[in-house]
Amino acid sequence: MSQNTSVGIVTPQKIPFEMPLVLENGKTLPRFDLMIETYGELNAEKNNAVLICHALSGNHHVAGKHSAEDKYTGWWDNMVGPGKPIDTERFFVVGLNNLGGCDGSSGPLSINPETGREYGADFPMVTVKDWVKSQAALADYLGIEQWAAVVGGSLGGMQALQWAISYPERVRHALVIASAPKLSTQNIAFNDVARQAILTDPDFNEGHYRSHNTVPARGLRIARMMGHITYLAEDGLGKKFGRDLRSNGYQYGYSVEFEVESYLRYQGDKFVGRFDANTYLLMTKALDYFDPAADFGNSLTRAVQDVQAKFFVASFSTDWRFAPERSHELVKALIAAQKSVQYIEVKSAHGHDAFLMEDEAYMRAVTAYMNNVDKDCRL
């Protein structure tokens, strides 16, 4: 399906918002930019718009290529495009880079209008609520009163849930994939270790490393390597690499010997080349802070009591970072609140990263659900 169809060459757009944005922590961004990409056409009724919310290291480039020479397509190209589960022949699809990101939206790499210098570590902490608030401003800009669906995996799924809670009248369907209604203690611990790798890098320079012409590459590399391990399933990792060595025998040293070591270092190096350390810190804290039930006496059922959206919730059998049990919490709360919810647990060997992959059962389920979303657009 995905190999024969594509949205083709796409061009990002930077949307300026000359308005203040008051953040959850009480600070204010005097203005902000959001980098977006759109695919498909908004219909005359403006009721076929789908918002794609990205995970920790994602961005606005969801599908297609920026040029014919690009080696890689967007991060969810197998999901979004003509004839794909989120069909751009039927839906107007919007992808964006969230506030605090490093791919064109306002973030640590942006110029602070009050100082004329890069924000760096001075960019304020942002939360999932803040992202959804900025995304609502984007919807207003695009003339979209209500999303046909808000879709996201992992941290993106948290945004889809928050949309349904914060703006119940503006979301008809929420697709929450490989996500959770809040992070587990273990996940918070993983994030802290990753941040410590960055914060203690001698080249971090209190977050103003660019003004010192340095990059905390070692810390960011280690953070990514550790994070990447948690996105994979143990059995899948074992089948892919086993105990395979890069040479014929042990070297009895600390150089790269096992193939899995080589793979992780490659992933770390690649990440350092495309991502910003301050953004990584911000994104992981947004994950930690997400807990919509906290505003409702720690009751998730009360948190979703006023949602109007219908829900599609998906988890993956070997995802131990966002285990199926975490999706069950959301499903049970929605049922207790008498909301519409469809749930699927996909058997997969790929751990948390399965939400990015082209599993047949997973793709069929999303396709079937999006067919219903399309029918709602035609009522």
Curated annotation (Swiss-Prot):
- Cross-referenced Pfam families: Abhydrolase_1 (PF00561)
Question: According to its UniProt record, where is this protein located?
Answer: Cytoplasm
Residues binding substrate, per UniProt: 224, 353
* Pathways per UniProt: Amino-acid biosynthesis; L-methionine biosynthesis via de novo pathway; O-succinyl-L-homoserine from L-homoserine: step 1/1
Sites marked Important for acyl-CoA specificity: 321
Q: Name one GO biological process term.
A: methionine biosynthetic process
**GO MF entries:** homoserine O-acetyltransferase activity; homoserine O-succinyltransferase activity
Against InterPro entries, the record matches this protein to: AB_hydrolase_1, AB_hydrolase_fold, HAT_MetX-like
- The identity of this protein, by name, is Homoserine O-succinyltransferase
Organism, as annotated: Neisseria gonorrhoeae
